Swiss-Prot record:
Family annotation (Pfam families): GDPD_2
Role of this protein: Dermonecrotic toxins cleave the phosphodiester linkage between the phosphate and headgroup of certain phospholipids (sphingolipid and lysolipid substrates), forming an alcohol (often choline) and a cyclic phosphate. This toxin acts on sphingomyelin (SM). It may also act on ceramide phosphoethanolamine (CPE), lysophosphatidylcholine (LPC) and lysophosphatidylethanolamine (LPE), but not on lysophosphatidylserine (LPS), and lysophosphatidylglycerol (LPG). It acts by transphosphatidylation, releasing exclusively cyclic phosphate products as second products.
Cofactor(s) demanded: Mg(2+)
Catalytic activity of the protein: an N-(acyl)-sphingosylphosphocholine = an N-(acyl)-sphingosyl-1,3-cyclic phosphate + choline; an N-(acyl)-sphingosylphosphoethanolamine = an N-(acyl)-sphingosyl-1,3-cyclic phosphate + ethanolamine; a 1-acyl-sn-glycero-3-phosphocholine = a 1-acyl-sn-glycero-2,3-cyclic phosphate + choline; a 1-acyl-sn-glycero-3-phosphoethanolamine = a 1-acyl-sn-glycero-2,3-cyclic phosphate + ethanolamine
Protein name per the record: Dermonecrotic toxin LhSicTox-alphaIV1iii
Organism, scientific name: Loxosceles hirsuta (Recluse spider)
Single GO term (MF): toxin activity
S-S bridge residues: 45-51, 47-192
UniProt keywords, alphabetically: Cytolysis, Dermonecrotic toxin, Disulfide bond, Hemolysis, Lipid degradation, Lipid metabolism, Lyase, Magnesium, Metal-binding, Secreted, Toxin
GO terms of biological process kind: killing of cells of another organism; lipid catabolic process
Amino acid sequence: WIMGHMVNEIYQIDEFVDLGANSIETDITFDDNAMAEYSFHGVPCDCRRYCHKWEYINTFLDGLRRATTPGDSKFRKELALVVFDLKTGDLSSSTANKGGKLFGQKLLQHYWKGGNNGGRAYIILSIPDLDHYAFISGFKEALKTAGHEELLAKVGYDFSGNDDLGSTRTALNKAGVKDREHVWQSGGITNCVSTLFRGLDRVKKAVSNRDSSNGYINKVYHWTVDKYGSVRDALDAGVDGVMTNDPDVIVNVLNESKYKGKLRLATYDDNPWETFKP
């Protein structure tokens, strides 16, 4: 999976897919009432990127729906997976549940069109703080209450704070997510900082967990990877996805002889919740 990083304006969906991304990551900010408000990152953000691109969340979800709805003039068949980087820092452990409920309702209305022929992409809820696990519980509850529990088949989960894997597993379980129930595990650091500061040790541990008989992880991705050498290192470590500001760099590496016969770009027909067995 080539995961286009910080796609917060609608026009960027085409920009990143044109460069080779089959997945995008979008930042979601919340207001004082725990309601998702904007697709927006703000400062600081990755080097070589403008940090202030934004849309109102409803507008962005409508645009995303069109990009992932077959038959729509804006449809991009390559775009199969969307990571919502949920900026829950302003939520508390007690308002996280409310935030999840409200976000579930918003996705149901603006992305899934009330469950009637909405966008088809798989969705990952990526949360930076283990203490906010109740966001997931609230999200699931919102879809169940609305009578659309079936949409949870399209939803996966990630904690992005580089926490201890055992603690991450506990937080997922508390949220009602079973081991290997649509679990992606991220690991990484901003592209402004050398990967020497946070190498691939944690990513390799996550890959080992994914491949063990008693792990909790389905897929592992590394962020934010823009340099050719770092991409090769991540692929050699066995990741399933690479989050990047430069999707074309990943495409070029995948076309190198070392990887060409071994790895390919995922399509919509590849289930992102199934652990890949080469």
